[in-house]
Each structure stands twice: as C-alpha cells, then as structure tokens.
Amino acid sequence: EVWKPHHLERDGNIELVATTLRRLHALPLTGRSFDSTVAARRYVATINNRDTALVAHCERVIERMRLPHNLCCCHNDLVAENIITAPGMMFLDWEYACDNDPLFDLATIVEHHDLGEEAAFRLLDAYFDGDGLRWQPKLREQQDLYLALYWLWLASRPDSTQDELDALGRRIER
C-alpha cells in the first residue's frame, strides 16, 4: 500500500517510520554528500518570484548550515507517497539519496506533512529510543533547513501556486 499523509496519523506508524529510518541510516555511506548550498543555488537560478526577501532569508538559513560530521545514508525525500507497506515498510524514489545528517530525513517527515509538536517528538523519541529531548534543537535546525529548501524548490517550479508559496512562507516565518 502506498502511503498518504493520513497514514502518519495511524497508531504506531510514526514509530514504525522511526525504526525503518534507523535501519536505513545504518547502511554504508553512499560516497556522495548532500550539499544544500548547491541545491539552493540551482533552485534560485530558476526562480521568478518577486518575494526577494524570502528568497534571501532561505539562502541565509541554508548557508548557515554546514555539512554535518555525522553523515549517514539518507533518503532525503521522505514524503508519505514515498513510503509503502507490503507487508513491511519500504521507501521508494531514491533519486535524492546520498549521505546527509540523519535528522534531515526526520525533518522532512515533520515539515513536509506539517506534523504537530507532539507527533514530531514521538518520531524523534522513537528514533532515539527514548532520548528524543536531547535532539530537539538539532531537529529544529534541520526543519528550518528543509523548509528553506522546500520553499526554494517550490518557487522554482512553474506549476507552483502563489497560495502554496504563501502558506509555506508563513510556516518559515513562525
């Protein structure tokens, strides 16, 4: 079964995602590292958006983030539609997979689906076997990075609507 965002709300599914992510992150390194600055520049080069202040803000957020020291094999595009159960959980669509901070995968799940604080903490706590509180500040950094990249990506796409960009922009500003 291909997941939809509502699957994340079902009992035990967030914990199942965390467990599956731990297995993914234990795989050998790919030898390619995710460079958010290069990705951002590629998106910015094709943006026709008049919100130059938000573009600049997103670029600053991304530039502040440095390549993490704790690299692991990451999916980097974990949206619900890239998760299936058949009967175990598997991830699809590996085109963005490369080495990155493991918390970027968690941040993608949290921010792409606009999970609330409680669900975000459950994911983090399950991923770190009950030690999620200690990792909340690092997750927040990765959430900010994901939102900035996601907004730039969305702004670079001709099929994106202004309503989508505005809604995501409000989330970035909170």
Please state what every model-predicted region is.
Residues 27-76, 86:
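An alpha-helical support segment within catalytic cores of ATP-dependent transferases
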Residues 83, 99-101:
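Conserved protein kinase catalytic core
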Residues 73, 90-93:
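Pre-DFG segment of protein kinase catalytic domains
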Residues 82-91:
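Conserved protein kinase catalytic/activation segment
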Residues 103-131, 144-160:
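Active-site activation/catalytic loop segments of kinase-like enzymes and analogous catalytic loops
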Residues 52-53, 152-174:
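ATP/Mg2+ or Mg2+-diphosphate-binding catalytic cores
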Residues 1-34, 50, 68:
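ATP-binding pocket architecture of kinase catalytic cores
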